[in-house]
Swiss-Prot record:
The gene is yjfA. Pfam families: DUF2690. Keywords: Signal. It comes from Bacillus subtilis (strain 168). InterPro entries: DUF2690. The keyword Signal applies. This is Uncharacterized protein YjfA.
Length: 157
């Protein structure tokens, strides 16, 4: 009986130790603002660019920018990509927001975004993710067309 108790105690200790060292598995967070448009509850009006990164083509020319936007009122983040010139047929631009804590990700085509930028357009934005500290997020932008892919990633905020 004493041996059985000792073995059970060791197994329990091992399980607790593994979770303490490795951490519990990450779970997707769910917040009221996740997936909503930046214009929901007027979040965009308090939005500012916290991080940005230029999209640079093979000729080393800046052709656009991807921004990580943050609303100080709503405590949310979203991504926006803006190209220097209006897109022509066959080209598109899309942005993506990713929350680091759980990997929740949206792009301009997600519900709450305004759709990827296509011919005749210059920009698009993603839905929001709740981003109050200790959460952080980053933005990714991609411009693509026939035989062309240019992308950029911001730092996290």
């Amino acid at each position: 009986m004493k041996r059985l108790f000792m073995k059970a105690s060791l197994v329990l200790f091992a399980v607790v130790f593994v979770f303490a060292v490795k951490g519990a598995p990450a779970k997707a967070e769910t917040h009221a603002y996740d997936g909503k448009s930046p214009y929901y509850n007027d979040c965009a009006s308090s939005g500012s660019t916290k991080k940005s990164s230029n999209l640079v083509n093979a000729s080393n020319q800046v052709i656009g920018v991807v921004e990580l936007k943050f609303s100080s009122t709503c405590k949310t983040a979203w991504a926006k990509i803006t190209m220097n010139n209006t897109l022509t047929s066959g080209y598109e631009a899309n942005a993506e927001i990713t929350r680091n804590t759980d990997g929740k990700r949206y792009n301009c085509d997600s519900a709450g975004g305004n759709g990827k930028a296509v011919a005749g357009q210059k920009s698009c934005y993603t839905p929001m993710v709740y981003d109050l500290d200790p959460r952080t997020s980053y933005a990714f932008g991609k411009y693509s067309g026939p035989n062309l892919n240019v992308w950029a990633t911001t730092g996290s905020y």
